[in-house]
A protein has these predicted regions:
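Extracellular parallel beta-helix/beta-solenoid repeat domains
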Residues: 1-206
Length: 206
């Protein structure tokens, strides 16, 4: 289908007819409360959240989700199905042996992975943003056979605190990402007061 949109106010000067732009209908975006669920043995990923409004994910069990347990995506390049997340709270969840397979967006147990074709020249950030809470990940329990816990790309505002990370040997480690945290084009990131039972708190910033 083709739609014609008529604006009542002038558009920002950055928006021109020289390139394409994606439009999200904010009036159709919900707040999300996702609690007390068991997510188990899923293919590809456990859950995918994508709304600019408040999202709370708490008291869930993510058990052997195969791919990433929680994905915050963002795509106007292929799937055309997700926009930015501005206010996400992930707390008091249990994550057991995610990432037993490799699929799209499976960079860590929690992957914040918008598709940005030219990240090097991106001037702003896709997720989070000025005046927004961004993504807070706190008071969770991670049990994992591999290394990556959090992957984040193009986000302004990210907190990872008061989490417990326990290493096990249930499966052979195989993931190409050998660090706990990998951060690409991020700002206002806090990683603090976490308990890594094996002492590995490795962070890669790019």
């Amino acid at each position: 289908k083709e739609y014609r949109i008529i604006f009542t106010e002038p558009l920002d000067a950055e928006i021109t007819d020289k390139e394409g732009f994606g439009i999200e209908n904010l009036s159709w975006c919900p707040e999300v409360y996702f609690a007390d669920n068991v997510i188990r043995n899923n293919r590809a990923r456990g859950t995918l959240f994508s709304t600019p409004l408040k999202t709370v994910v708490e008291r869930n069990l993510f058990d052997h989700t195969s791919g990433t347990a929680i994905l915050l995506c963002g795509d106007c390049n292929g799937w055309f199905e997700t926009g930015a997340c501005r206010n996400v709270l992930i707390r008091n969840n249990r994550f057991i042996n995610a990432l037993t397979n490799m699929f799209q967006f499976t960079e860590a147990v929690i992957s914040i992975y918008p598709e940005i074709p030219d990240l090097e020249h991106q001037k702003k950030y896709f997720h989070g943003g000025k005046g927004e809470k961004g993504v807070v990940i706190e008071d969770n329990y991670f049990e994992t056979f591999d290394r990556p816990v959090l992957f984040a790309k193009s986000i302004d505002g990210l907190v990872f605190k008061n989490n417990v990370i326990r290493q096990n040997t249930d499966y052979p480690a195989f993931h190409h990402n050998k660090t706990r945290f990998r951060l690409l084009h991020t700002r206002n990131v806090k990683i603090e007061k976490n308990n890594f039972e094996d002492g590995d708190e490795s962070v890669v910033r790019e």
